[in-house]
UniProtKB/Swiss-Prot annotation:
InterPro entries: ARF_dom, ARF_plant, B3_DNA-bd, DNA-bd_pseudobarrel_sf. This is Auxin response factor 15. It is found in: Nucleus. Homo and heterodimers. One of its GO terms (cellular component) is nucleus. Its main location: nucleus. One of its GO terms (molecular function) is DNA binding.
Amino acid sequence: MTGIDLNTVEEDEEEAAEEVAANGSSPAPARAGAVCLELWHACAGPVAPLPRKGGVVVYLPQGHLEHLGDAPAAAAAAAAVPPHVFCRVVDVTLLADAATDEVYAQLSLVPEKEEVARRADDGEGEDGDGMKQRFARMPHMFCKTLTASDTSTHGGFSVPRRAAEDCFPPLDYSQQRPSQELVAKDLHSTEWRFRHIYRGQPRRHLLTTGWSAFVNKKKLVSGDAVLFLRGDDGELRLGVRRAAQLKNGSAFPALYNQCSNLGTLANVAHAVATESVFNIYYNPRLSQSEFIVPYWKFMKSLSQPFSVGLRFKMRYESEDATERRYTGIITGSGDTDPMWHGSKWKCLLVRWDDDAEFRRPNRVSPWEIELTSSVSGSHLSTPHSKRLKPCLPHVNPEYMVPRGGGCPDFAESAQFHKVLQGQELLGFKSHGGTAAATSQPCEARHLQYIDERSCSSDASNSILGVPRLGDRAPLGNPGFSYHCSGFGESHRLQKVLQGQELFRPYRGTLVDASMGSNGFHQQDSPRAPGVVNKWQAQLHGRAAFHGPPALALPSQSSSPPSVLMFQQANSKMPRLEFGHGQLDKHENDRRVRFGPSEGIERREQRIPLQPYPTSGEVIDGQVTVEKSHSPGRHGKDGPDNKAVGTNSCKIFGISLTEKVPAREELDDGDANYSLQSLKQVPKSLGNSCATVHEQRPVVGRVIDISTMDMMI
């Protein structure tokens, strides 16, 4: 191995260049002192720290111990060495291994008192760093990681065009095959000759003759890096960076077998006690963190307010021997080893923003990083993948749930319609009868309801209707609640399952009521004040309203599961008339009256109960269905047609054996409707009808229950 004196680099280099030029084309060994300083730094890497001669540094024995591989003998002597040793640089000798061309340095240090070191460093600081000034004069250079074709015996070395034009002498492109001979010297001033040619399709710069000999001599493999450097004098130099050195992370056996007695902590402890000179062998590429730090840099890091949550950036050398900047966040701090209490060596715990490309340590030293900004504590969680996330709408915190204790826990977003298979052709009908693309906003909606987890499993306690979003219920009345039945979906969602594609989802309720001033009123529709007052007067003094009438789902085995029945005996609704409906001119039409028992105008309507209501869907009078007097309707589905309802096969209420006619839309003023296929009423229903009150005081609606073929 060879070494050079930093003070005599330029003179020795010029003398060696004259001698090497006369040796011919064969590689010739160079004498000591012929190593170029710029080439050494280029091989060491862009972030390799190296103090200048006469400078003041801080030596950290803990980092040196890690650099040596944690030798037991060195660990035993660590107790006599302080965690930080202030030193003055006596000499710097740049060395290179003859077998591997790996660079390292021998530093001669003498311990100093902190006060003496501070006075010696006054006026220097960052501007007085001689090594940074030398880097500013770095000549033209390019570095390339070798590929498999670059290391093959029959191939050559492909040089990027811009790099060839910047570092190599210019070619004569007027020739048919431009070429020239290049002469480059390595760290040991050994000359290597290559043929530089510009050829191929497309044309490119290649090093052919002499390249295979260089690869075999240096034992280069794919992944190693080769660099070419042209100085100010035009001389071309050649160096290598081995990728295996960064991966192994261990010291060179030849280096430390010869010099281990000079770099142990035992000698350091003796030198600190006697204030004598000690030598440190330092490989900048092997050390994951600096353990010899300039004094100004060390003191500057101590003045920085490092705390949890601060963001930082750090220069780091990747495997391709290029300098990169990585960012991260500080997650903690503390001593790495209790034996070195108070040591600043890797005292910061960090988390990198992206640690997939290159594995970096989770501990860094304060002088290695640069603070950028601070973040809140909520950003300390594990980072996620940068996938686009849907922007969910804000839910009103006043949108309360009874017995829920806060905002409803929607299983799905409240602002997105859920469409299942076969529902793509359906539209959504808003409260006003027009198609709406989205649900009404939840702001200013004060509703109380029971979500899907609170729905009763007892069919007799299930209520078909849920309120329209436009209606409000006083939050102060806990007895006024809405229950959902069916599939337990949120009432904000329009959901249709497979088989329900032929029917539009409805907005509204069968019994659309709200409570106010001990009376019923419709907030969305105009009404006469006299009628409302009369209605309130009739209810004055009576029991409080406990909820809309319940539509019981039958539990008898004789009743089909798709038939909906009205609850009679268990109904707690006051002032409701119960009676038997009478058949009209069509045997299959039965009617249910809605209305008060006295003093209020009645009006009868036929409202179809759709064969498959789902929870969260409501029924309104202004819907689009088939006219009741369509031609040929009773001829097919009339009472004389015995085949209907007996031999048919249905799934979710849809017949698989008969063709379902298309529906036509009626005007909003037409209130007569009929179902697609009329079926015979089961015996379990009898002639029982329930006259329940509608929310609208002057309107009575008649519901045909004999044709109901409902799905639970």
